[in-house]
Amino acid sequence: MHTLLETLLESNVINIAILVVILIRFARQVVGEILVQRQQQVKEALEEASNRLKLAEQQLKTAQEEWSQTQEQINQIEEEANQTAQVVKEYWLKQANEAIAQLKTKTQQSLSQASRQVAKQIRQTLIELAIEKVKQTPIDGSQILDRHISLLSYHEAKNR
């Protein structure tokens, strides 16, 4: 019995050893294939990430260039707007100054005309008063007339 048991144990041990060797070989192949597949997946993921990074960097560069161009356009528009505003301001200041000058001229003309009109009216009134006084005064009328005529001449010379 002992020999049979020993034989069985020895054959079981041999079978187990064979099984372990087979399992180790298959496990190595399976684990190796799994590792190769995993390595390939990691490699592909890294390549994809690298490609996405390159694409993102390129898009960032493009966006920065567009931003720079936009800033330049904004600066140009602001400069043009300032120039246009200055031109418009100068135009309206010129128009206002011309209007003021015209108003001054018209006012001066109006004042001159009114002054002449008043002087004319004063002369007329003085003449009428002088004539009336001459008619009412028995004194020598030529003296009174001479006096009023000299007054008229004085006022006329003064208003010129």
Swiss-Prot record:
Which parts of the chain span the membrane according to its record?
12-31
UniProt cross-references to Pfam families, sorted A to Z: ATP-synt_B
Q: Which UniProt keywords apply?
A: ATP synthesis, CF(0), Chloroplast, Hydrogen ion transport, Ion transport, Membrane, Plastid, Thylakoid, Transmembrane, Transmembrane helix, Transport
Q: Which family does it belong to?
A: Belongs to the ATPase B chain family.
Return the InterPro entries for the record. ATP_synth_b/b'su_bac/chlpt
Question: Which additional comment does the entry carry?
Answer: In plastids the F-type ATPase is also known as CF(1)CF(0).
Subunit details = F-type ATPases have 2 components, F(1) - the catalytic core - and F(0) - the membrane proton channel. F(1) has five subunits: alpha(3), beta(3), gamma(1), delta(1), epsilon(1). F(0) has four main subunits: a(1), b(1), b'(1) and c(10-14). The alpha and beta chains form an alternating ring which encloses part of the gamma chain. F(1) is attached to F(0) by a central stalk formed by the gamma and epsilon chains, while a peripheral stalk is formed by the delta, b and b' chains.
Instruction: State the annotated membrane topology for this chain.
Output: Single-pass membrane protein
What PANTHER family would the database entry show?
Answer: ATP SYNTHASE SUBUNIT B, CHLOROPLASTIC (PTHR34264:SF3)
State the protein's name. ATP synthase subunit b, chloroplastic
> Where's it mainly located?
plastid
A single Gene Ontology CC annotation of this entry is: proton-transporting ATP synthase complex
Q: Which residues, by range, are in coiled-coil regions?
A: none
Instruction: Tell where it localizes.
Output: Plastid, Chloroplast thylakoid membrane
Q: What is this protein's gene name? A: atpF
* Stated role: F(1)F(0) ATP synthase produces ATP from ADP in the presence of a proton or sodium gradient. F-type ATPases consist of two structural domains, F(1) containing the extramembraneous catalytic core and F(0) containing the membrane proton channel, linked together by a central stalk and a peripheral stalk. During catalysis, ATP synthesis in the catalytic domain of F(1) is coupled via a rotary mechanism of the central stalk subunits to proton translocation.
Record GO terms (molecular function): proton-transporting ATP synthase activity, rotational mechanism
